[in-house]
């Protein structure tokens, strides 16, 4: 436990450089992963909308030919 506290805090009670760099890397990684997750979700939504529109058009054409 002492090692962990020594890793987190320096002698003057400030957050150590290693710990602050670790936190910064974790936060930046989370931001990058979130960006790509949102980007992928938007692309998937757009692709699904295209499929729905195509299916709707095919169904509409098929039903318009029925007399």
UniProtKB/Swiss-Prot annotation:
The N-terminus is cleaved by the prepilin peptidase EppA, which recognizes the class III signal sequence. It is found in: Secreted; Cell surface; Fimbrium. The keyword Secreted applies. Keywords: Fimbrium, Secreted. Residues 1-13 form a propeptide. A motif (QXSXEXXXL) lies at residues 14-22. GO terms for cellular component: cell surface; extracellular region; membrane. Transmembrane segments: none annotated. Contains an amino terminal motif QXSXEXXXL, which is part of a class III signal sequence. This is Probable pilin MJ1400.
